[in-house]
């Protein structure tokens, strides 16, 4: 920690025994499976830095590996394979500008969010996964007085159209297993807060 910055770094290394993992087979129904032993390790980092009295930047992110420590024949997994439904990296970078609007204390914040990919099974099949994606968010806040605040938020500022979840697998079921879920489109919200 310094005069205009702060930083935190955490390393973790966990040996799991009797871990429960969630599996999504071709039928579409999820179930929990006794995964036996697994290892997870990685880093978590966050920092803030005040560039000047009005402008500051902050970052928070993590990077990890999560692997089975044993062979799981029934699921086609070998020791060292990535665990299903685990995200190996994600981060957020934010830029904040403090100012005044019509003499009211205000701020504007722009965030870049990155979400890493994950897979439903040990096979890491892209047709049954959550792909990685990046999106922008924007917030503008105004302190009207000591008790009330007004905030406008724009989620997915650039209206990015990308897949959040893909499920397209071969199966003997009579019902097609071929669909996709998108991340939410640009969404604008207005929030008024009053403290009493």
Positions of the model-derived regions?
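Strand-connecting loop/turn motifs
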Residues: 2-4, 52-54, 88-90, 101-105, ...
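Activation segment
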Residues: 20, 55, 67, 161-162
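Feature captures outer-membrane beta-barrel proteins of Gram-negative bacteria and organelles
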Residues: 90-97, 136-140, 190
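C-terminal beta-signal and adjacent terminal beta-strands/loops
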Residues: 113-121, 142-196
